[in-house]
């Protein structure tokens, strides 16, 4: 958040529980495609075998957008666990007076059929909600 990026973060974890990579949103760079889930998918494609990717889990603060879900599916990553849903994010943005995302939200399984997805996680979703409130208050005139 300190860099001006929306408060999203993800961790890529191997089947044995080893943290392989982590990243944060970088859309503040001016490139709206610099989503952390997309970056982790690219990292996984370059650094993991197909078997390792399939056995890995991505833990993320927010449900993948369609672009990131597609990247996840194309590289063959395994399970996704997300703290807050796209539906929750849309409600928070409305509550904060923010603009809706430019791309329609789709459930991850609509983009990547058959993938194992868990979320939202209620206890963590509240923490993500608080981060979005703090971000919006800091970087907008409306909070």
Residue ranges of each PLM-predicted region?
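Zinc-dependent deaminase
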Residues: 1, 73-143
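Immediate flanking context of iron-sulfur cluster ligation sites
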Residues: 50-62
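Residue-level recognition of the N-termini of beta-strands and the immediately preceding loop/turn
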Residues: 8, 54-57, 115
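Short beta->alpha transition motifs characteristic of CBS
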Residues: 20-27
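A short, polar/charged loop-to-alpha-helix boundary motif
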Residues: 28-43
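Short beta-strand scaffold segments in enzyme catalytic cores
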Residues: 8-17
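Short, flexible loop/turn motifs enriched in small residues
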Residues: 3-7
